[in-house]
């Protein structure tokens, strides 16, 4: 166990460091997401600059790179504490990718994937919370923030032994959204629908 867990942490970080947003944009001939739109190499920004197909590809890959290392570690019988560190390592890789100059995304989809092995019921509740918040508010960032705040309570209800590692993940997500929190507080955050509408209007001209 002592040798496997650190190895899985390194593996998770390297998986997280594969920035699908940058790779998908390169393959599709789209602008670098770090230099276009919001500047965040994640699925939401790829949706703005490249459309639904590219965004879905990024979303699926980002979820999988969080899910697979944790699922593998879970299957090996690694304890919840180490599972939490493995999940955080995958998110740290996404946020600070060694392969892309340590400039990555905010880790929401990767964190979601890392939580998924705990149970599909929990995964569905968290996904539903994000979707409902976005539909009601129009803010993708607010959906991530609300989901991160509530996720530890959901986990405590479904699988209490994983409350601490999921709480650590939630803190990481909230820290990465500190700029969004300030913009939301000042009412300066742009709704995702507004950005998509502007993109369509620009393309139609």
From Swiss-Prot:
Coiled-coil residue spans: none
Stretches assigned to the Periplasmic side: 1-3, 74-80, 133-137
Enzyme Commission number: 2.3.1.15, 2.3.1.n5
Q: Name one GO biological process term.
A: phospholipid biosynthetic process
Q: Which membrane topology describes this protein?
A: Multi-pass membrane protein
Q: Which domain of life is it from?
A: Bacteria
- Fetch the InterPro entries from UniProt: G3P_acylTferase_PlsY
EC class (word) = transferase
Query: How is this protein annotated for GO cellular component?
Result: plasma membrane
Catalyzes what? sn-glycerol 3-phosphate + an acyl-CoA = a 1-acyl-sn-glycero-3-phosphate + CoA; a fatty acyl-[ACP] + sn-glycerol 3-phosphate = a 1-acyl-sn-glycero-3-phosphate + holo-[ACP]
User: In what pathway does it function?
Assistant: Lipid metabolism; phospholipid metabolism
Gene Ontology terms, MF aspect: acyl-phosphate glycerol-3-phosphate acyltransferase activity; glycerol-3-phosphate O-acyltransferase activity
Q: Any idea where this protein resides?
A: Cell inner membrane
**Function field:** Catalyzes the transfer of an acyl group from acyl-ACP to glycerol-3-phosphate (G3P) to form lysophosphatidic acid (LPA). This enzyme can also utilize acyl-CoA as fatty acyl donor, but not acyl-PO(4).
Family matches, as HAMAP family = PlsY
This protein's name: Glycerol-3-phosphate acyltransferase
Q: Organism, per UniProt?
A: Salmonella arizonae (strain ATCC BAA-731 / CDC346-86 / RSK2980)
| Upper lineage | Bacteria, Pseudomonadati, Pseudomonadota, Gammaproteobacteria, Enterobacterales
What gene makes this protein? plsY
């Amino acid at each position: 166990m002592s040798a496997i867990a650190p190895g899985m942490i390194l593996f998770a970080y390297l998986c997280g460091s594969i920035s699908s947003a940058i790779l998908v944009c390169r393959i599709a001939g789209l602008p670098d997401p770090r230099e276009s739109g919001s500047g965040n190499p994640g699925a939401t920004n790829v949706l703005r600059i490249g459309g639904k197909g590219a965004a879905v590809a990024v979303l699926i890959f980002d979820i999988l790179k969080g899910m697979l290392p944790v699922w593998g570690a879970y299957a090996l019988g690694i304890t919840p504490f180490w599972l939490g560190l493995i999940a955080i390592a995958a998110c740290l890789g996404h946020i600070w990718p060694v392969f892309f100059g340590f400039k990555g995304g905010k880790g929401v989809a990767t964190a979601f994937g890392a939580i998924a092995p705990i149970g599909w019921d929990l995964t569905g509740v968290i996904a539903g919370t994000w979707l409902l918040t976005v539909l009601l508010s129009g803010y993708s960032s607010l959906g991530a923030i609300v989901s991160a705040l509530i996720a530890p309570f959901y986990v405590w209800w479904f699988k209490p032994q994983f409350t601490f590692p999921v709480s650590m993940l939630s803190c990481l997500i909230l820290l990465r959204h500190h700029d969004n929190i300030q913009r939301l507080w000042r009412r300066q955050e742009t709704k995702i629908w507004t950005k998509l509408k502007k993109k369509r209007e620009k393309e139609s001209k």
